[in-house]
From Swiss-Prot:
PANTHER family: RNA-BINDING (RRM/RBD/RNP MOTIFS), ZINC FINGER CCCH DOMAIN-CONTAINING PROTEIN 18
Name of the featured protein: Zinc finger CCCH domain-containing protein 18
The species this protein was found in: Arabidopsis thaliana (Mouse-ear cress)
Cross-referenced InterPro entries: AtC3H46-like_PABC-like, AtC3H46-like_RRM, Nucleotide-bd_a/b_plait_sf, OST-HTH/LOTUS_dom, RBD_domain_sf, RRM_dom, Znf_CCCH, Znf_CCCH_sf
Pfam family, one: RRM_1
Top-level taxon: Eukaryota
Function: Possesses ribonuclease activity in vitro.
SMART domains recorded: RRM (SM00360)
Length: 536
């Protein structure tokens, strides 16, 4: 909200509460406040009860200075008396005891007025017995009838309510920049609200040394429990709360989530002041971590160049080489070239037709730093070579390496040729085969169980269909399902020959050239085509 919007909101609220003198009251506020921008914004968001109290104070000040407003009768509550209404001087307000005694017409009105007087720093007469027994009515409070019955916690202009406070807990507490539903801040007064010298949100605000020392000791204790492991600044407040049962708090600091739109010490700046025992470590993507100073040397540094392949290892003795594929130098040539920088322990270049990278390991990490500091390019046997720092292998690549599909499964040569022919089937057949689940249905399982252990199909023995390695049952079931789909096509017929000799049933398949259906020998074959005579 800018200054113009805040002025419009304040003027509208004054016009609603005091329509007769709205222009004079609003003009007085503009003239007498030194820091008008901030004061107007605070007035725009203050409760109605506070706005009514401010209006009454301004009315009395205008009446006293210009004599255009007359003092209220003696049976009314005397209006608070104070000096000039400026932001730099705190309010000095006193209320004299009333002359008449009476009763409170409504306890809610009493609480509302007491809150208003406390907010304006009214002094001892508020707590005196004479003041508490005074006679007040809605008309004698100088407040409109509609405002006295209105909840003071409902501001006229909507404010941003804290989402986490509504859910039950906000770790920022009273320092949260959003509205927590409180009527009046506990540590604020009317003088603090309109004081231009208020430095709570100033960047130069000094953090208390006692608070800083206490916070440092608590963070050190928290880091020692981690045994040298760093803690990210994003998770530090929550870990601090779980450990000590309170929010991470130091006078004058704001967390990183609170910095947007509001000045103040960020948590990063606050921890940077603890240089003797705590170190801040840069992390990828702009994050920061905090670690004990004694453990900082053991931590992997992320200050160098970063990419998706991983982080640069601190103290690494390897370098990464890239070069054109047409280069012809050998590992021995690379070793001779880099020996001029330091002792070379190992050179690795993959044995590929188009090799384009390699690794060199040195005896000392200082040699690596010297080579990287020299820069690129390097020339080995007239080939341009680029040197890059060795990076740690990322977790994602390790995960993929552990879950690579099984390779090296060899099948019989004849079956491989037949498998190629199967892949040339019509789309209707091939799609139905590939879309089948790896598990067989019950009819297919019954057929597969009825097949003998040794059988021949299309001139191939059953050994050609066996895997040379121990394949999983799912692979076997999928192969058998694929085979059954192929056999059930209209262009292929499976010929089964059944023989009842020795009560054994055997299946014989003819080759693709012979499409003749051979019926098995039957003991009733002699009766075929003849009449069967019955013997009586």
């Amino acid at each position: 909200m800018n200054f113009t919007e805040s002025m419009n909101v304040v003027h509208a609220r004054i016009q609603q509460l005091e329509p007769e003198n709205a222009a004079k009251i609003f003009g007085y506020l503009l003239l007498m406040q030194e820091n008008g921008n901030r004061d107007m914004i605070r007035l725009a968001f203050c409760p109605d009860s506070v706005m009514c109290s401010v209006i009454n104070c301004v009315k009395y000040e205008l009446a006293r200075n210009s004599h255009h407003y007359h003092s209220p009768p003696s049976d009314h509550i005397p209006t608070p008396k104070f000096g000039s209404f400026t932001g730099s001087s705190p309010l000095s307000v006193s209320v004299s005891p009333p002359m008449k005694t009476g009763f409170w017409e409504n306890s809610t009105e009493m609480d509302t007025l007491q809150n208003n007087l406390q907010f304006l720093n009214f002094e001892d007469p508020l707590t005196s017995p004479e003041f508490s027994n005074g006679f007040f009515s809605q008309e004698r409070q100088c407040l409109p009838l509609r405002t006295s019955r209105r909840s003071p916690s409902l501001p006229e202009f909507p404010v941003k309510i804290c989402h986490y406070f509504n859910k039950g807990f906000c770790k920022h507490g009273n320092n949260c920049r959003y509205f927590h539903g409180q009527i009046i801040p506990e540590r604020e007064s009317f003088a603090q609200m309109f004081n231009p010298n208020n430095n709570l949100s100033d960047e130069e605000h000094v953090v208390s040394p006692v608070s800083l020392e206490k916070l440092e000791g608590e963070i050190i204790e928290l880091l020692k429990l981690r045994r040298g492991a760093p803690i990210s600044i994003a998770s530090l407040p929550m870990m601090y709360y779980e450990k000590y049962g309170r929010t991470l708090q130091a006078e004058g600091y704001l967390t990183e989530s609170q910095r947007h739109g509001k000045a103040g010490y960020s948590l990063t700046k606050l921890l940077a002041r603890l240089k003797n025992t705590i170190r801040l470590v840069d992390r990828p993507h702009g994050q920061h971590s905090v670690i004990l100073a004694e453990d900082a040397s053991k931590f992997v540094e992320y200050t160098g160049e970063r990419n998706e392949h991983g982080a640069i290892l601190a103290g690494s003795r390897q370098i990464y080489l890239t070069f054109p594929a047409e280069s012809s130098f050998t590992e021995h040539d690379v070793s001779i070239y880099f020996t001029s920088y330091g002792h070379v322990e190992d050179v690795r270049i993959p044995c590929q037709q188009k090799r384009m990278y390699g690794f060199v390991t040195f005896a000392s990490s200082e040699t690596v730093k010297h080579i990287l500091a020299k820069g690129n390019p390097h020339f080995i046997c007239n080939a341009r070579v680029l040197v890059k720092p060795y990076r740690e292998k990322s977790r994602s690549s390790r995960y993929l390496d552990n879950y690579k599909p099984l390779h090296g499964m060899r099948y019989g040569s004849k079956f491989i040729e037949r498998d190629i022919e199967m892949n040339t089937l019509p789309p209707r057949v091939s799609e139905s085969s590939r879309m089948r689940k790896p598990f067989l249905s019950e009819p297919e399982q019954s057929v597969s169980k009825s097949l003998p252990t040794n059988y021949s199909y299309l001139g191939f023995s059953s050994d050609d269909f066996k895997l040379t390695s121990n394949a999983e049952q799912e692979e076997q079931a999928e192969r058998l399902s694929y085979l059954l789909d192929y056999l059930n096509t209209e262009d292929n017929v499976m010929n089964i020959t059944t023989n009842y000799r020795d009560n054994d049933r055997r299946t014989h398949c003819e080759s693709l050239d012979s499409q003749v259906l051979n019926l098995p020998e039957s003991p009733f074959s002699s009766l075929s085509g003849k009449e069967i005579s019955t013997v009586t």
